[in-house]
């Protein structure tokens, strides 16, 4: 189990190498930019008894993780039904377009926004979010019954996570054995996060000041 999502810049393949650099003693794990969660999931498996505090500024993604932790059965039930009602690429395209409209609807429950986010993530090119377009191939291979079935196991795994939607600096600590992992968005040509990439731009400007400014 690596991650329930397809996420740009995700570290699922790099996790084994990253873990080679872990300190000998860790009493708490914190992650400022959760994203696809590969590193936090690995740390939970390696250190099942330590506190895990993860943070995500992008609201739809934060709500997905929150719903996965607290309402995994609901996500599973809704997504299974939607997949069964939209088995072909034509109907999946309309499901994707509807989900894109729902991801940022404040009037919806956080659970239904999480359902919408998962659909957009799984049915788009490269796991992009609201700035993405529909991928027929992804709607078959990634928005799958098998992937939805796995959500229950992920829900159990992260049941003790503390999940927040805060400024990344809130997770900083002076305690020597608190391990903070920070992997902010990359500066790339494509806008990856949020509506038309606005979240991606904001994150870059906010979290990546020039060394000359320090």
Predicted regions span which residues?
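Gly/Ser/Thr-rich active-site loops/lids in small-molecule metabolic enzymes
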Residues: 199-205
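Conserved, well-structured beta-alpha core segment at the onset of a catalytic domain
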Residues: 4, 17, 22-26, 42-49
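Single conserved hydrophobic/aromatic residue that forms the stacking wall/gate
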Residues: 206-214
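SAM-dependent nucleic-acid methyltransferase catalytic core
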Residues: 1-17, 24, 69-194
